[in-house]
Amino acid sequence: MSTNKITFLLNWEAAPYHIPVYLANIKGYFKDENLDIAILEPSNPSDVTELVGSGKVDMGLKAMVHTLAAKARGFPVTSIGSLLDEPFTGICYLEGSGITSDFQSLKGKRIGYVGEFGKIQVDELTKHYGMTPDDYVAVRCGMNVAKYILEGTIDCGIGIECIQQVELEEALKEQGKDSNDAKMLRIDKLAELGCCCFCTILYIANDKFIAENPQAVKKFLKAIKRATDYMLAHPREAWAEYGNFKPTMQTDLNTKKFQRCYAYFSESLYNVHRDWRKVNNYGKRLDILPENYVPNYTNEYLSWPEPKEVDDPEKAQDLMLKHQEECKTCGGYKRLVLA
């Protein structure tokens, strides 16, 4: 049986930052483009690139480092746009766990990670801090890093500031503790990368699907851009509409996550060339990409002007850190505006 339905696989169960995809469906933007999109949730986040690459699913979401590694491993996927730009990513832990800002404090600790590349990143970092991978215990957690930290199953784990870090902060508040006791050792700082772009969340698609359906890809991105524009202009209304469609979003915790995600959303959806160069080099350093590897991304299907890249990305990251601290304290919806 054949179908004109296009399948789109999220990188995990519905989360606050998936809002543009759901809004494009809720508000009829896909329908306006004559698209019928089936939004799917994986049972295992590590399956996404394999399912999209094998053609079992047409499109999906995945982080930049995973997208690069997937193509290098023979799964024909390409990034066609950006969803969440450079969310701060690192090793989350709690004050009093024996972990400090010194990476060597991780010796003997149980470190949780989502998928194999998280372990590869930590293993590579040990080389730079006088340690080996045998100096810590790796625990695969999927998306349950914060839960496992709170339960005591692990001492720390890899997460992003606007999701797992928020989960830890809010759990501490419920316990009557200081939310500032939720800490993060940022991987970009530890690895001296100059950006958190390796964890940028991307819209990806199967290469054969792109080649055979270029207009559908353009229309999909046009609908996503329209949804993104609406969300950025009307965050409260957009969040309410998402919550009506996905009642699991209607919690204080998820609202706080959305507020913290808000500044990271890519307004243009463009793949940032400089970020791809950095992560391509980082992938080679991690030995997951060959030396002659060419990054697998395209902006060909974005039909609006490409914005100018940020002049000083490291300064922008410093400003974003201050911005997110303010959001943590005050809440609300505010974008970082660079002069």
From Swiss-Prot:
The active site is at H66. It comes from Candida albicans (strain WO-1) (Yeast). The modification N6-(pyridoxal phosphate)lysine is found at K62. Pyridoxal 5'-phosphate binds at G115, E116, F117, G118. Coiled coil: none annotated. The lineage of its organism: Eukaryota, Fungi, Dikarya, Ascomycota, Saccharomycotina. The keyword Transferase applies. Keywords: Iron, Metal-binding, Pyridoxal phosphate, Thiamine biosynthesis, Transferase. Pfam families: NMT1 (PF09084). One of its GO terms (biological process) is thiamine diphosphate biosynthetic process. PANTHER family: 4-AMINO-5-HYDROXYMETHYL-2-METHYLPYRIMIDINE PHOSPHATE SYNTHASE THI11-RELATED. This is 4-amino-5-hydroxymethyl-2-methylpyrimidine phosphate synthase. Responsible for the formation of the pyrimidine heterocycle in the thiamine biosynthesis pathway. Catalyzes the formation of hydroxymethylpyrimidine phosphate (HMP-P) from histidine and pyridoxal phosphate (PLP). The protein uses PLP and the active site histidine to form HMP-P, generating an inactive enzyme. The enzyme can only undergo a single turnover, which suggests it is a suicide enzyme. Its cofactor is Fe(3+). Transmembrane segments: none annotated. Its EC number is 2.-.-.-. A motif (CCCFC) lies at residues 195-199. One of its GO terms (molecular function) is 4-amino-5-hydroxymethyl-2-methylpyrimidine phosphate synthase activity from histidine and PLP. Pathway: Cofactor biosynthesis; thiamine diphosphate biosynthesis. Belongs to the NMT1/THI5 family.
